[in-house]
Every structure is written in C-alpha cells, then in structure tokens.
C-alpha cells in the first residue's frame, strides 16, 4: 500500500515538472509530450488545454481530441521526416506543437513558426486539401528567418513584372487563396501575391510537396 502511494506521489510531482520544463524551453503553457522518440529528433507536443501567448496575448490555440491528434500526427511526421536531424539543427527547428483553431489577432492561420524558440505551432484542423503542403510552407519560414541573407527579398522581387507590388504584410491583403494556379503568370497561388516571403514559401512548399503546375513560367 505504501509503495502504491509512493508511485502515485511521484507521478503527481513528475507531471507538473515536465510541464514546467516545456514552458521554460519554449514559453508556451499547457503543453504535454506527444512523442519525442523520432528519427530526426523532432519533439512533438500537444495542447492539453487551450493556450494564449504572444507579446499582446494575441495568439490562441485549443486542445485537440486524441483521435484527431493520432490521425494528423502520422501525416505531420511523414512530411517532416523529409528533413534530417542535421538540417533541422541548422535551421533551428526542434519542437512541433499540435493544437487546433490556431489564430493570431483573430485571424486563423495554418501555423506559426518561431526559429528563436525552435518551435512550429501547427493547426491540425487546417483545411485537409492544403494541410501537407502548408507544413512545408511553414518550415520555409523557419529557414528564411534563420538565413535572411540568403533569401534576399529585393532580388526575389526583381523577377516580378515592374508594375507589380507586394502588400506591406501578409495580413494587409485579401490575397489569401491557396489553390494552385493552372496558369501561373509569375505566381503559383493567390497567396504568392501577398508578400515576397509568402511567395518564396509557396514556391518551396510546392517543390517539397510535389504538386507544381504542369507548366511554369520561365525566369
């Protein structure tokens, strides 16, 4: 009986300790470990309760059911296993946070990358039609944020028609469509027209996911 009580006490003490450790690492509360034994050493975490983060507390995400987590985890892992441990270390990505109904300032989003905290938050309820592709889109933002000198937005923008201008930010425009154009006219999706960084991310995601249009424009 004493042994049983001791085990219960240990479990009670260890669980909060793990949660506190996770918070100290990535500054996101209410998380628990989903899987940390992966090929490329990515740590998968999930929301055990809704959480709110950000300087202005403007980022929100909610707990998912185990059934939904199990289903989407397989898809996420399959796609992110394309990136080696060495590559992920170079770009500073270590933690994948799974939750649903992810939003920033009230605007729903597929993912929120943070190369400083080595974290990518993923909305597992994002549109299934684009879900796998947007995983690579968000990974590109991690790459871009880690190597801004390589991905020069001015050089990228110079390939566009002179009369075209990107929006000041991705949320400053209504160009949010993710459907792949059959006729690209210099852009692969409507969202590509929003900002240079989103344009790069859309091209990268199509290359990684393997669904480039049948014909693309010459540079």
Model-predicted segments: where are they?
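Auxiliary, metal-adjacent structural segments of Zn-dependent hydrolase domains
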Residues: 54-116, 124
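Hydrophobic h-region of N-terminal signal peptides that target proteins for export
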Residues: 10-17
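Sec-dependent signal peptide recognition
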Residues: 2-9
């Amino acid at each position: 009986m004493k042994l049983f009580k001791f085990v219960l006490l240990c479990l009670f003490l260890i669980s909060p300790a793990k949660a506190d450790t996770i918070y100290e690492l990535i500054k996101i509360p209410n998380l628990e470990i989903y899987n940390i034994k992966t090929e490329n050493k990515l740590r998968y975490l999930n929301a055990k309760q809704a959480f709110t983060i950000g300087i202005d507390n403007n980022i929100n995400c909610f707990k998912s059911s185990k059934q939904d987590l199990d289903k989407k985890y397989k898809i996420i892992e399959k796609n992110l296993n394309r990136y080696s441990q060495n590559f992920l270390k170079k770009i500073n990505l270590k933690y994948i946070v799974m939750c649903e109904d992810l939003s920033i300032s009230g605007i729903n989003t597929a993912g929120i990358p943070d190369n400083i905290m080595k974290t990518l938050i993923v909305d597992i309820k994002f549109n299934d039609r684009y879900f796998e592709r947007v995983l690579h889109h968000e990974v590109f933002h991690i790459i871009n944020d880690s190597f801004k000198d390589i991905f020069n937005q001015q050089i990228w923008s110079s390939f566009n028609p002179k009369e075209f201008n990107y929006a000041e930010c991705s949320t400053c425009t209504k160009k949010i469509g993710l459907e792949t154009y059959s006729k690209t006219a210099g852009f692969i999706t409507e969202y590509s027209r929003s900002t240079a960084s989103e344009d790069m991310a859309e091209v990268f995601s199509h290359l990684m996911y393997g669904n480039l249009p049948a014909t693309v424009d010459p540079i």
